[in-house]
Every structure is written in structure tokens, then in C-alpha cells.
Amino acid sequence: MTALEPRPGVLLRVLPPSLYAGRASKVVERSMLAYSRMWLVFVSGVFEPLFYLLAFQVGFGRLVDDVVGPGGQPMSYVAFVAPALLASSAMNGAVLDSTYNVFFKFRYAKTYDAMLATPIGPLDVALGEISWCVLRGGLYAVAFFAVMLGMGLVTSAWAVLLIPVALLIAFAFAAVGMTCATFLRSPSQFDYIQLAVMPMFLFSTTFYPLTVYPEALRVVVQCFPLYHGIELMRKLSVGVFDVAMLGHLAYLLALAALGLWGVSRRLSRLLLS
């Protein structure tokens, strides 16, 4: 098989070559080479959520009593917040990578125009950029989980599933974030992105349970994508399972699929028309 021959796969059989050529890994390789010269920037992303976690352990954790966790069992406030911070970290990292970086590659560097001049399709670009966000988020998730383990915040063997859930959260938000980036016209419009991300971080039960809200507001909060990621992680962290977890999982999978479809269509329309 030569370098220009497409690799076999289901998508290659059902999608036209102009949309998908099976070379998303080449986009990931490009990102790896680019960040090999900026490894300090790459590594620094893991510290922000860790600082939050340490602040809660040293400060708030000593001031707040145990709270009621999933399944009605008591848990320390730090253990309650830790899975939510991991989910928030996956969201923030994915949104940052898939909006700022993608915007400048798309609007100024014209990176994607150059890519599409090669045997690479818009879906390859979308999958490659999203996969890079997921890879980066996965490394951060492993580091965060290791700190949780060292701080004694992991009480169930099921908590190891926090890492794949973090990858799913990163994929979903990266896909949606990349789609949004294609609509931006100037750097000042990134404020709109933060206007959506910040309320989700603050109000998606990150720091307190859903029951603190009035009934009407609970419905609004339950529409937030981050809420579903946090609830899924929080239950896995203590080994509690219920039917609602399937709903949380389905929501994130649907969001990921919708975002991937949206960004591939946008790139096709903007770069191939």
C-alpha cells in the first residue's frame, strides 16, 4: 500500500473521497509536531484543575461538612467536587483547543486550505482536530485522576471509568466548539464562547447538587451538556449505578455525533465551495 492509497474502513466505503479519505491521523501527527516545540504550553494545561482541587482540599474542604453524594451516601466535599472538576477540565481544554486554535488556523494561517489541497477531506480535518483535543484531554485526565488517587479521593474501582468519560466529554465539546469556531469572524467574538462556557462551569452542579435549585431552574440546568458529564462522573467515582446514567451517556454521544456532523458540513461548505 502506497502513501496515497486510502486505508480500508467502513467510512471509506460509504462516504465520498472528497469528504473523507481516511487520513485523520495525519492531522493529529501535524499537531504533535507543532506542539513538540511548545511542550511547556502543552503540559501547563494540567495545572489549572489541579490548583482548584488543591484549593478545595486545603481551604473549602476544611470548612464544609460532608455532603450527600450519589445514592444518598455521605462523602467529603472535596470528593464531591473532584469528579466535577475533572469533567470541567475536559470541557475547558476541548473548547480552548477547538475554538482559539481552529479559528486562527482557519481564518489567518489558512492551514485547512493547505490540508485540503492534499488527499485529505473535511471530515479528516474535523476528526483529526477533535482527536487531538481528545488525546490532550486524555493526558490531563490521567494526571488529574492520579492526583485524586494520591489524595485518597478514589473510593471505588469503578472510578477508573472517569478517564474514558473525560475523553467522551472532550470529544463532544471539541466537536461543538470546532463547529462554533467556523462561525466566528473576529477574535472579539470569543467572548460569546466564554458567555456559554462560564455559566456551564458555575451552574452545572459543579460545586453543589441539583437539589439547591428551584424546580423550574433544575430543568434548565439539566439541559447543560456539562451537567450530564458531571453526573455521570460523580456516580462512577463512588460506584453508584442507575438507569439515569444511560441518559447522560446518550446525551453526550448524541452531542458528539451532532458536533462532528456540523463541523464536517461547515468545513465542506466553506473550503470546498
Language-model regions, residue ranges each:
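Hydrophobic transmembrane alpha-helices and immediately adjacent juxtamembrane helices
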Residues: 1-273
